[in-house]
Amino acid sequence: MIDVLFLPEPVSQQHVCVVVDVLRATSTIVTALANGARCVVPVRKIAEAKKRKAENILICGERKGIKPKGFDLGNSPIEYFTVKDKEVILTTTNGTRAISMINSQKLYAACFLNLHAVIEQLRNHDHVTIVCSGQKGKIAYEDVLCAGAIVYELNDKLTDGARISRELWKQSRRKDLSKLLFESQHAQELAEYGFSSDITFCSQTDLYSIVPVFVEDRFIKQAP
């Protein structure tokens, strides 16, 4: 059975969950790990992130799209090409909040950048819940679209949420993904802040072949 939650809610189960925040937290997590970060530790609050500052630890994230004062990096995935051997502490408006609400047997991070790597990982599991992070408590088109792309490739029983997301992807999958993302409300807000290049970057499919898996309090690369 595959379920898709359009907005985050407390999830506690002995199955597999996938968190999706295309713009931009899970895209940033995937990019950081693909470029050699030791791990990505999601935290809820800015103060909590700052407490963890130390050598070889980067304090990263955003509030209202903007890097907080004193942080090393924002939430733009294109800032994470030079994080080899660093521990990344990440706090964001939507993605890390969604992550904090999930308690599951396994938790993976997905976006378009690692789409088929996640799909292949999920073929080994019978029960999957995909949690869309949304944007400020509202449904985010790009997250539901990505969830639908995952569901589309998996032959299993579907909840109504999974069926809706799959149908959205079926109607959209032959269209220009970058153009689709730019039309989303969240993308338009990011573009106003000057992050158009992030939207273009996050619309790439299968740029990376890694799957972040949550272990204890952090995301690491899933072992091959």
UniProtKB/Swiss-Prot annotation:
Cofactor: Mg(2+)
Keywords: Hydrolase, Magnesium
EC number(s) recorded for this UniProt protein: 3.1.3.71
PANTHER family found in the cross-reference section: 2-PHOSPHOSULFOLACTATE PHOSPHATASE-RELATED (PTHR37311:SF1)
Gene: comB
Family: Belongs to the ComB family.
Broad EC category: hydrolase
Organism lineage: Bacteria, Thermotogati, Thermotogota, Thermotogae, Thermotogales
InterPro entries referenced in this protein's UniProt entry, alphabetically: ComB-like (IPR005238), ComB-like_sf (IPR036702)
Catalytically driven reaction(s): (2R)-O-phospho-3-sulfolactate + H2O = (2R)-3-sulfolactate + phosphate
Pfam family, one: 2-ph_phosp
GO MF: 2-phosphosulfolactate phosphatase activity; magnesium ion binding; sulfopyruvate decarboxylase activity
Identification of the protein by name: Probable 2-phosphosulfolactate phosphatase
